[in-house]
């Protein structure tokens, strides 16, 4: 029906996400994927959860809300000011960040049409960092690309 969705979850998903904590009736964000010929209005969100974070603070900011999330170093290394991060599947712009936390603005539309309207301090959220950042790190890291690599590193 229009209000239900079923999916299988593999152990990797349960290890990296908060989905194992959900109970029947809990709300989740579910969006249709963008078509290749469609408009990309945010960043590429694959739906692969990289890890979890915690809602640390929520403060009003005009009609919007500033929401601060704490996250582990493995996530924070890819979070930059004015960059993108997916929180519970929603592509959001980072307002600011430091070594262990980042803040986003939740506009009224997002608050009313996603799970953010019911989020509170202490809630565990799913985080997905920008895939481009992970690829760039991999490409510029000082490792041996191995035989058959398209690009070799000059020494």
PLM features: residue spans?
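Conserved loop->alpha-helix
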Residues: 1-155
């Amino acid at each position: 029906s229009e209000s239900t969705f079923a999916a299988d979850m593999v152990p990797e998903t349960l290890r990296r996400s908060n989905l194992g904590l959900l109970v029947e009736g809990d709300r989740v964000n579910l969006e249709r994927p963008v078509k290749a010929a469609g408009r990309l209005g945010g960043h590429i969100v694959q739906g692969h959860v990289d890890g979890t974070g915690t809602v640390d603070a929520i403060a009003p900011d005009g009609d919007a809300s500033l929401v601060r999330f704490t996250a582990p170093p493995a996530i924070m290394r890819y979070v930059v000011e004015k960059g993108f991060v997916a929180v519970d599947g929603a592509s959001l712009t980072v307002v600011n960040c430091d070594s262990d936390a980042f803040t986003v603005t939740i506009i009224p539309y997002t608050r009313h049409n996603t799970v953010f309207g019911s989020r509170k301090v202490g809630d565990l959220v799913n985080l997905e960092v920008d895939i481009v950042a992970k690829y760039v790190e991999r490409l510029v890291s000082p490792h041996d690309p191995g035989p058959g690599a398209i690009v070799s590193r000059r020494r």
